[in-house]
């Protein structure tokens, strides 16, 4: 794996099972990906968004949530740490900000982290909410 690669959907699924995500958390993550990709696919032509990065970060944003239910660790921080150790640096940066967003610039260009953050807030459990 090259440094800072983005895992494929198959690699994301393998990680989901390797780290024993609960079925309800998997379902939530899949819905977050659906919303994220719906946003990404409907952006104004020419908007520079890495669709693969959005998909991977959406699927993996709760990668350590199952274990955090027992350890009480912050799953955004532990998930980012795990993904950095695996070499997925850009995915890790998005995962780390899906709970507490930082450095938002309303006038700036849209970023992948904003899409995943927003999509996660629009999905409660496995339902899309307004």
PLM-predicted stretches and their roles:
Residues 1-13:
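Short alpha-helical hairpin
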Residues 2-4, 41-46:
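Short acidic/polar alpha-helix capping motifs at helix-coil junctions
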Residues 14-20, 24-44, 55:
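A positional/architectural concept
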Residues 16-19, 44-130:
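Divalent metal-dependent catalytic cores for phosphoryl transfer on phosphate-bearing substrates
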């Amino acid at each position: 794996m090259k440094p800072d690669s983005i895992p494929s959907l198959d690699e994301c699924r393998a990680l989901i099972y390797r780290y024993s995500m609960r079925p309800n958390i998997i379902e939530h993550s899949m819905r977050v990906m659906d919303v994220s990709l719906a946003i990404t696919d409907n952006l104004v032509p020419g908007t520079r968004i890495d669709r693969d990065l959005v998909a991977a970060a959406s699927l993996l944003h709760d990668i350590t949530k199952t274990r955090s239910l027992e350890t009480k660790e912050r799953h955004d921080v532990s998930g980012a740490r795990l993904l950095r150790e695996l070499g997925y640096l850009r995915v890790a940066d998005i995962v780390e900000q899906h709970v507490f967003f930082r450095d938002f610039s309303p006038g700036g260009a849209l970023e992948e982290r904003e899409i995943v953050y927003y999509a996660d807030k629009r999905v409660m459990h496995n339902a899309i909410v307004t």
